[in-house]
Amino acid sequence: MADSLVSRRPRWSIAPYFIVDDVVSTANYYRDHLGFQYERFWNEPPSFCMVRRNGVVIMLAQLERTGVMRPNRTVDPEGGAWDAYIWIDNADTLNTEFKSKGVKITRDICDQPYGCRDFDVEDCNGYRLCFGQDLEE
């Protein structure tokens, strides 16, 4: 539908910036479990990486000794907050893929009153990602 939210999105993009315990193991988790790819790590020892899948980019930065990881659910555990909402073409297919790879599904797939079909996963650092498709397309 031409009037849907997804169709009206400008051609801009955004990349969530996640502070993680271990950049290398997190990048490998995103590759092996969530189907993302990466080309390189920055610095030695590695302290930064960008993972990509179908145009989605997530930045991973090494937790400094004085820093604190803070997934949104840590700030508001009752709020059901996501750290990222990722628009996809087929939620059912991706949900099946993730389940076959042992990804932790924190909310199973369902149709939402806001016109999307989506589900939530939790990554190896506790970040919550929601993957959803626009039902009006």
For each feature predicted by the language model, list its residue ranges:
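Major-groove DNA-recognition helix of helix-turn-helix-type DNA-binding domains
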Residues: 34
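Conserved active-site tyrosine of GNAT-family acetyltransferases
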Residues: 26-31, 98, 123-126
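Vicinal oxygen chelate
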Residues: 2-17, 37-89, 95-122, 132-137
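Conserved beta-strand-loop-alpha-helix junction that forms the acyl-donor binding cleft
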Residues: 20-22
